[in-house]
Amino acid sequence: MTLIKSISGIRGLIDSSLNIDLIVRYVQAFSNLSPLGKILLARDTRNSGSKYINHSIDLLNRTGRETINSDIIPTPTAQFVIIKNKYAGGIVFTASHNPSDWNGMKFINSNGTFLDHEQFKKLEEEFNNCPTISTTIDSDLIVEENDSLKSIDSHINNVLNLNIINKEMIKDRKHKVVVDCVNGATSVALPKLLENLGCDVIKINSDYNENFGRSPEPIPKNLSQLSAAVINNNADIGFATDPDGDRLSIVDNQGNPLGEETTLGLCVFYILKYFKEYRKHPIVTNLSTSLVSEQISKKFNTPFIRTAVGEINVVKRMEKEGSLLGGEGNGGVILKDSHLGRDSLVGAAIVLNLLAIETIKINELFDALPKYYIHKSSVALKPKNENFENKIKEYFIEDEINESDGLKIIRQNEWIHIRKSNTEPILRIISESESVARSKELVEIIKNEIK
C-alpha cells in the first residue's frame, strides 16, 4: 500500500507506508518552513501516535525547536490552541475516519488552518530535500508539557462564550444526550462540553482507546449502537464524531440517523434565523454539499458560495469573501468566531441551542428542513474512461456545468458531481435530487456514459 497524500495531509498503514523515517522527514520539512516559535504536537487515540510524537519531539529538540506535547486532543482543539497561543504551527497524528491500523499527519499552519495547495507543494519539495534522519526516544526530551485537559478546557470555554450560544437557555432545557465518540479524541471534550451546558450525558464508545468500537466514519450505517442507546435511554438527541473530532453526525430522538449532511443544514438554519447580521455574509460550502444548506440560505436572502472539496478550500474562500459560517456536508461546521476549521464541539453547541430556542424535538426540526436525497457511488478509473469529462459534457450539453473540481452538472433541484478521488484510483459520483430513486438514476446515467 502506497502512502496516500491529499489536501488534508498524508495517511498510510502504520509501520508500513507510514514509518518513523518518513514521519521525521516530514516533521523536519514542516519545521523548516514554519516561522520561529513553538510547534504543537497532538494525536487521536491510535497508540502509534504516541510513538510518532516522541520521535518528533526528539528531532525538533535537536534542531532547536521548542515543542508543545498536547497528546490526545481533537483536531479542532489543536487548531484553536495554535491560534490562541500564537504557536508557529502544529502536527496532528490522525488518519481521521480510516481504520485503526492506519495513521497519518495533518499539518496546521500558524493561522490554525490546514496547508493550502501551494503550502503543501512546498512541504513536499522540502521533504524531498530532507535526508533520512535518525531519532531516538531515549534521550532527555526538552518539551513544554501542555496538559491536554488544559487545551480542551480552553477550547470548551471558547465555545461556551460564543455570541451565538445562549448557555443558560440550553441549561434550562436539561437535554438528555447520548454521545458516541468512537473512543477517539473527543471522548473527553464532547461530554465535558455537554455537561457544561447542563445536559444529562450518556456515553458509549467514549474512552480513549484505539479499538474504536464501531466503524470510525460517523455515517448512518455505522451508528446502530447510538440509535439503540438513544431509544433505550429515551434521549433527546444523539451525537457521533469521527476519531479526530472534526465531523459531527446526529441521531434523532426516535433513534433515526439524520445523515451527516443534516448537521450543517441545522446550523445554517439556526444562525440565519436568529442572527440577522450573519445574513450579510455568504455561507461557503463545497461542491458536494447538500442543497439543504443552499435552500435555507436562499430563504434568508443570504449569498451562498461553493468551492472545490477540501476544508482548506472552503476556509480560503471564507477568508476571501468575509464569510462567518461555512463547512462541508460530511458533518463539518466552520464558525469563524471560534476558528477556521471544522469543529464537532461548535456544531453540537449550535444544534443544542437550536433545540432549546425552538422548543420542539429534533425529529420535528429535521422534518421542517428542505428534503433532498444524496446518493454516492464510485467506479474504477481505467484507461478507457480517463477522458470521461468529454463524454459527460457532451451528454449534458444543455445543462450548467461547473468544472472547478471535476465536473458538476447542475439542474433545478438536482445535481451530479463526478471527480477523481485524491486517495484512490476511482471516480467518485455523487448525486442529489428530491427523491431517492431519482438520485440513483442520475448516478446510473453517469456510469453508463463512462463505460
In which residue ranges do the predicted regions lie?
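An N-terminal, well-structured beta->alpha segment
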Residues: 1-66, 88-89, 142-177
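Gly/Ser/Thr-rich active-site loops/lids in small-molecule metabolic enzymes
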Residues: 116, 203-205, 256-274, 311, ...
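Short beta-strand-to-turn element immediately C-terminal to the catalytic PLP-Schiff-base lysine
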Residues: 15, 107-110, 249-253, 334-336
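Proline/glycine-rich low-complexity loops and linkers
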Residues: 121-157, 161, 253-329, 334
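N-terminal small/polar loop signature for handling phosphorylated ligands or for N-terminal nucleophile
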Residues: 28, 32, 39-103, 192-251
